[in-house]
């Protein structure tokens, strides 16, 4: 008897209960999240004195960040508060996990404090899945980044940014540049881009920083920066994740910038209206030149702004779906 695989993110009716990965989400589901985010962007842009909606009033959102974060944790906190939720940011270093308590023990204790949603960042790939398997039926889990595996809300806000500036995914060439081997953002972006019908996704980087299997995902691989940037509509730059590297994968940051840094001269090889993105934090002079990061084609700060609305959309959608 064949066992039917069930996506752990979805309810029995196929609705989004947790957001653990973009992989496995349909084009319609991703589009629904982006459309919902548009409504929250309009709320932020409006003249309303109070930019809040009561969607999560009376709900408790626990931000559990086992890795450092500035943008992601802050935007999740702002998003939850704009949805009128009560927000708790757990200080991991001061918590019982630093004294040897297991991850599931921590989750069980926090669940006993009437948590309705966990936003989780963890160094171990799969940690949010483990949590989602063990929480009470009414509790929702959102992956804010797990190891090298996935960063689904970053992927979604990247898609929102691309759609905002380029409108149609089906005629774009998108280049992802840098340390793709260690990047959970790259994996989420690739799954989202291919699901949304982008005809050409390129990966640009040195052989030591590109994972195997990219071609099987429909990605064109380039080791030469100039060749890879020719005629692209979108450039997504990634930082070097030195904290995840084992061994000497690069000669030096200076040599890396010479070969793969995005300079105005290299950006000129892309289409004249190409946009430049970066999930942050940026390392100026390593993967990107300040003239590009602060230039007219950069939409990096737009990504941060849109991230609040996208995370509001995700939280609002999952909170409404239970088995």
From Swiss-Prot:
Catalytic reaction equation(s): carbamoyl phosphate + L-aspartate = N-carbamoyl-L-aspartate + phosphate + H(+)
Source species: Cupriavidus metallidurans (strain ATCC 43123 / DSM 2839 / NBRC 102507 / CH34) (Ralstonia metallidurans)
Gene this protein is translated from: pyrB
Pathway linked to the protein: Pyrimidine metabolism; UMP biosynthesis via de novo pathway; (S)-dihydroorotate from bicarbonate: step 2/3
UniProt GO MF annotations: amino acid binding; aspartate carbamoyltransferase activity
Name of this chain's protein: Aspartate carbamoyltransferase catalytic subunit
Superkingdom classification of source: Bacteria
Function: Catalyzes the condensation of carbamoyl phosphate and aspartate to form carbamoyl aspartate and inorganic phosphate, the committed step in the de novo pyrimidine nucleotide biosynthesis pathway.
Self-association state and partner proteins as the record states: Heterododecamer (2C3:3R2) of six catalytic PyrB chains organized as two trimers (C3), and six regulatory PyrI chains organized as three dimers (R2).
Gene3D superfamilies: Aspartate/ornithine carbamoyltransferase
Record-listed E.C. numbers: 2.1.3.2
InterPro entries assigned to the protein according to its UniProt record, in alphabetical order: Asp/Orn_carbamoyltranf_P-bd (IPR006132), Asp/Orn_carbamoylTrfase (IPR006130), Asp/Orn_carbamoylTrfase_sf (IPR036901), Asp_carbamoyltransf (IPR002082), Asp_carbamoyltransf_Asp/Orn-bd (IPR006131)
Binding residues for carbamoyl phosphate: 71-72, 121, 151, 154, 280-281
Upper lineage: Bacteria, Pseudomonadati, Pseudomonadota, Betaproteobacteria, Burkholderiales
SUPFAM superfamilies in the cross-refs: Aspartate/ornithine carbamoyltransferase (SSF53671)
HAMAP family reported in the protein's UniProt record: Asp_carb_tr
Alphabetical list of Pfam families matching this protein: OTCace, OTCace_N
GO CC annotation: cytosol
Residues the entry annotates as binding L-aspartate: 99, 184, 239
Similarity-based family: Belongs to the aspartate/ornithine carbamoyltransferase superfamily. ATCase family.
Gene Ontology BP terms: 'de novo' pyrimidine nucleobase biosynthetic process; 'de novo' UMP biosynthetic process; amino acid metabolic process
Keywords attached to this entry: Pyrimidine biosynthesis, Transferase
């Amino acid at each position: 008897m064949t066992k039917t695989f069930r996506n752990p993110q979805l309810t029995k009716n196929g609705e989004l209960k947790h957001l653990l990965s973009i992989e496995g989400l349909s084009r319609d589901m991703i589009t629904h999240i982006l459309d919902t985010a548009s409504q929250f962007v309009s709320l932020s842009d409006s003249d309303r004195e109070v930019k809040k909606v009561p969607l999560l009033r009376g709900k408790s959102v626990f931000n559990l960040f086992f890795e450092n974060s500035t943008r992601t944790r802050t935007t999740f906190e702002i998003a939850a508060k704009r949805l009128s939720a009560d927000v708790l940011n757990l200080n991991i270093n001061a918590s019982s996990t630093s004294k040897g308590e297991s991850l599931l023990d921590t989750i069980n204790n926090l669940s006993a404090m009437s948590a309705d949603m966990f936003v989780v960042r963890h160094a171990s790939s799969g940690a949010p899945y483990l949590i989602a398997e063990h929480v009470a039926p009414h509790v929702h889990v959102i992956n804010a980044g797990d190891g090298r595996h996935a960063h689904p809300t970053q992927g979604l806000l990247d898609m929102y940014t691309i759609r905002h500036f380029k409108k149609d995914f089906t005629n774009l060439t998108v280049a992802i540049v840098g340390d793709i081997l260690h990047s959970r953002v790259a994996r989420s972006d690739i799954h989202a881009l291919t699901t949304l019908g982008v005809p050409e996704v390129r990966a640009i980087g040195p052989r030591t920083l590109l994972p195997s299997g990219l071609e099987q995902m429909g990605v064109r691989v380039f080791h030469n920066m100039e060749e890879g940037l020719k005629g692209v509509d979108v450039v997504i730059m990634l930082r070097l994740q030195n904290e995840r590297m084992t061994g000497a994968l690069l000669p030096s940051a200076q040599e890396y910038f010479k070969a793969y840094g995005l300079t105005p001269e290299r950006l000129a090889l892309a289409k004249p209206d190409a946009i430049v993105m970066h999930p942050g934090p940026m390392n100026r002079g390593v993967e990107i030149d300040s003239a590009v990061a602060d230039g007219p084609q950069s939409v990096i700060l737009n990504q941060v702004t849109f991230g609040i609305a996208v995370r509001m959309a995700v939280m609002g959608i999952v909170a409404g779906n239970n088995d």
